[in-house]
């Protein structure tokens, strides 16, 4: 449904009251006249595609070489396969670990109770 000019003026006045201290009113009016939302989006996307942020450039070059995520993932998987993980489960004759751990009782039964 079409909006009346009264409702648009009311909305504009409310927004100026709420956010007017961030921008002077003459800047608000100039920006509103210069930009339409549909026209500004393609320009914004085109401008941002050419920008390169410093941390993006640094993340691609580590140690003077181009950074490739596939190579890092392959190296990580290779390291995991070459180094077996130690199983830290309970063993029947493991050492007493004291409070809040596994403790060997007098009769040789394992328990996880206190000190």
UniProtKB/Swiss-Prot annotation:
Its tissue distribution reads: CNP-115 is differentially processed to produce CNP-38 and CNP-39 in the heart and CNP-22 in the brain.
Q: What is its main location?
A: secreted
| Cystine residue pairs | 99-115
Give the UniProt subcellular location, in the record's own words. Answer: Secreted
For this UniProt record, give its keywords in alphabetical order, as a comma-separated list.
Cleavage on pair of basic residues, Disulfide bond, Hormone, Secreted, Vasoactive
Query: What does UniProt give as GO cellular component?
Result: extracellular region
Which GO terms are recorded in the biological process aspect for this UniProt protein? Answer: blood vessel diameter maintenance; cGMP biosynthetic process; receptor guanylyl cyclase signaling pathway
Report residue spans for region: Disordered.
Answer: 24-49
- InterPro entries the record matches: C_natriurtcpep, Natr_peptide, Natr_peptide_CS
Please name the GO terms that the record assigns under molecular function.
Answer: hormone activity
Pfam families named among the record's database cross-references: ANP
Q: What does this protein do?
A: Hormone which may be vasoactive and natriuretic. Has a cGMP-stimulating activity.
**Family assignment from sequence similarity:** Belongs to the natriuretic peptide family.
What is this protein's record name?
Answer: C-type natriuretic peptide prohormone
Q: What organism does the record attribute this protein to?
A: Scyliorhinus canicula
